[in-house]
Amino acid sequence: VLRASAAGEAAGVPSSTLVCEGFMGLAAASSIGLGMPNLPVARVVGHPGVQSKEMLERNVLEVTLEAVIDNLLKAPKSTGKGDEPGARDVIAKGGFQEINDYFYDHGLSDGLPIVPPTREKVEAFLRFTDRDPGESLGALLPDSRAATIWSIAVNGVMAGCRPEYMPVLVALIEAMADPAYGVEHSGNTPGGETLIIVNGPVIKQLGFNYTQGVMRDGFRPNTAIGRFWRLYLRNVAGFLPHQNDKATFGNTWRVAIAENEDLLKKIGWEANSADFGFAPGDSTVTIARYTGGNHISSVSGATPESMMPYLYDAVIRQYSWQLMFTVGQGMGTLRPLMLLSPIIAETIAGWGWSRRDLKRRLFEHARIPAREFERILRDWTQKPTWNLAEEARAGRIPKVFHESDDPGRPVPLVWKPEDYMLAVTGDLTRNSVYVFAHNGVLGYPVAKRIRLPRDGEGRIRNG
């Protein structure tokens, strides 16, 4: 809404954005990022979702309306920030503790010790890319800072990455800057956190863990690169708690995971990256934002048919309000992700099933009654009545959502089989799956190729 207000103000049209009082700080910080630190906002007392109709009306008339009128007649005082230091400016000097205290006090760290980004360390990272340090990959909302190669190296140093990780970091920020991903939603209420999936030769070149404990910290590439992602969101995009990051509870950054491509080759399955058009042998990163997840232990059975009920149930139980990204706010943007332990994938593939077959079965059988789907939409959106039949007849959703008028008819969670994402990773001998709850259009899956510099493999070998 603030972006619409900024566009109106830029065109000379007065505006006033209604903002719940818990988001006033976010509005002020976002206005600065939009280049209009005096963007007019009007406070909405409390939260409308927990107020009676009478209380809401009284608060709007007594508080909000007056602010709206003032905003349309005069601009509020500026809340702008001072000038920021240049890319190569020295901002602090001292020992390890002094530097860490400075970065923490100025909101530049995640609360854990950082590696001081000295010029020497930053330049070591730059030797692992052929790109100009001043090149910008795009302006990242909400602060509209340029995502430069230099700033990628700086935050990579701080996160504890090794210099040879630089090509991965660049690919990640290319993905972050992709409009399809929606970085501007990174601080929204559910507090979703991005998961990074790595594919290709770079997995072994850099030593990523892709077996037991794949989502656990303790493996440097997985851990440091996951930490880098959150540091970059803070320091460049501008997502800081109590400011632009308004997650109600939030999540801690996730370690990056890698697929077990040895197992994929053995069973004849394509990698996750193939779903995004990449060829075998391409090193890639895939990002998407998830609000939670659930581990399903002991998926038992000697055949796919005996295993699949566990998988259907796992997907169904993970999704409630997120169905608004299937029908509603996101309209077809829900992308559930399922991690399969190698023994599960190998058993399913052993009966001749492909990844495509597995996705098709999930689409056909992981379903809920239409009346339940409509109830979830009614309860979790502001629209009091939902009718899947009307949506399908109007052509807004696929016809599979209205194959009959039976309110108990099973309907899918997504629009088509290809909407499911699969990755094979984790303990080689455990029969488990993990299902992530996707945040839809507010963190849509994006994949980018990792491009090594000239003689990149040689540089990586030599460290």
Where are these regions (language model features)?
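Gly/Ser/Thr-rich loops at beta-strand to alpha-helix junctions
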Residues: V1, T17-G25, E120, P163-Y165, ...
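Short, acidic/small-residue loops that bind anionic groups at enzyme active sites
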Residues: L2-A28, N38-V44
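Flexible, glycine/proline-enriched loop segments at strand-loop-helix junctions
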Residues: P14-L18, V50-N59, T211-N222, S297
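Short Gly/Pro-enriched loop/turn and capping motifs at secondary-structure junctions
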Residues: E21-G25, G49-V50, I344-E346, L428-R430
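Short low-complexity, flexible loop/linker segments enriched in glycine and/or proline
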Residues: S30-L34
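A charged, well-structured terminal subsegment
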Residues: V45-G80
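Non-transmembrane, aqueous-exposed alpha-helical and coiled segments at domain scale
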Residues: P85-G463
